[in-house]
Amino acid sequence: MRFAVLFALALLGAHEYSLGQSTQSFTNPIIAGFYPDPSICRVGNDYYLVNSTFSYFPGITVFHSKDLVHWKLIGYVLNRPEQLNLDGQGVSRGLFAPAIRYRNGLFYVTCTLVDIGGNFVATSKNPAGPWSNPVWLPQINGIDPSLFFDDDGKAYIIYNSIPPDNKPLYNGHRTIRIREIDPESLRVKGDERVLINGGTNIEKKPVWIEAPHILKKDGAYYLIAAEGGTAGQHSEVVFKSVNVEGPYVSYQNNPILTQRQLNPKRAFAITSTGHADFVQTESGDWWAVFLGCRPYRPYEEEYYNTGRETFLAPVRWNDGWPIINPGHEEVQYRYLYPIHPSTDSIDIPTSGNFRSRDEFDSKELNLNWVCLRTPHEKWFDLMQKKGYLSMRLRPETCAGSMNPSFLGRRQQHLSGSASTALVFNPKAENEKAGLLIFQNEKHFYFLCKSTEGNEPVIQLYKSGSSGNSTSGMELIASSLIGKDQGENEVLLRIEAKEDKYSFSYTYDSGRWIVLKDSIDAKFLSTRVAGGFVGCMYAMYATSQEKESNSVAAYDWFEYSGDDEVYK
């Protein structure tokens, strides 16, 4: 499949961080859009990074980079239905907080499949895959597992778990625990130990200590973890010990990363930073990847539709303790490159402003496209109509809890657009195909072609159950387009401008017809919709709980991002 990058990323002129002699800077976030909970490892001069994917399939993104800045999606850990069944799972359930590690020619990814199987390990000799089926760890009671391989050959698994005796002292009281694990058989052994009870200072009732990782430096063990919850109070903290199993001492200057103390009205705010992982370059420098959020105006109200994104910042060691983002309070949109910039080609940028177009002219779907939950049958095809993505209409809907005919890619910018060209001849009013902007089952907008009284029509639906509703949607705008256009290709476009979406269509690409302008985008924000994901633009076709043999064919899909902060 050919993706043409039509507009390269533009870097903003903001604060710079002086590191070494380099004069080139990179743009944060390094992986924009809904790519949360990053974990990273280095093998030689190659870097690999994974993210949470919740109930999207394939599960657990695997990125590769040579310079920590330019990232290419190379595969998924769980890309076979027998590895991962997400039937019935809410969008913000599924796969939580993976961690990637490497030992003796083998990559390990640990993760939690919440509500279903619990914690597991998957392995592969090639990070691009294929990966093994999950090896389940029923003895590990908790979430956010991470492996640590010590110098003596022993391996440990660290995770977030229940309070001592499962008796919380306050809401949000959790522990960090450790158990030894056999790196060959992946069997847990030995006794469980509590490393951290509550957080940095239990007398102050710290909440949601989670996402632990252990690293070793100069003979000392460092445990880093997130604290404060994933919203505005999010932070990263560190503990230190001379023994891997503790006791651990909290750093007196914790947290080592947070934005919670800053003016919420500051322009182009980066908020909710935490859930970090460390990596050391070949030259010995340390860097941290972590999640953060970018609200749109008014910044202090914390509305964002792009989800939690992956950021990169330098780490400085001071008197035996690490500090993320040294010399700054605010996380920077620009830092100097950690490594000489790579010249490797990237088909789709992950940072800055860009435009990309998918022509659907390959035998395989580009890795950027994801399904909503696990597909159990073949419902899309790239060869049925050459140069088109053909999608069968099926009874499942995006408001349900199964796998609809839905192929999505992330909204990676506060301002931008998604557009597509659709060939579709609906045979009944329940048949609809088009372009979706989707947050979760109860928060989405659907711009589609359908039929009304035997006349072709362009419709805009909002998720909901009031008014003129069908299958979890409420009709908010429509336009009859005439039978002479019924079988012609129609172009559909959704434009995002921070807190507004606009919906347009055309049969002539030079003259867009606005169906509905300036619709509330806050309705799809994390603050309103809840959960842990960000918005997806999706090609979506449904027959709304009825059987159908109709097919929708998409000629191309174009995504464009144009955020002010990068200009």
Identify the residue ranges that each predicted region occupies:
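Bacterial Sec-dependent N-terminal signal peptides
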Residues: 1-23
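Carbohydrate-active catalytic/glycan-binding domains of CAZyme proteins
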Residues: 19-567
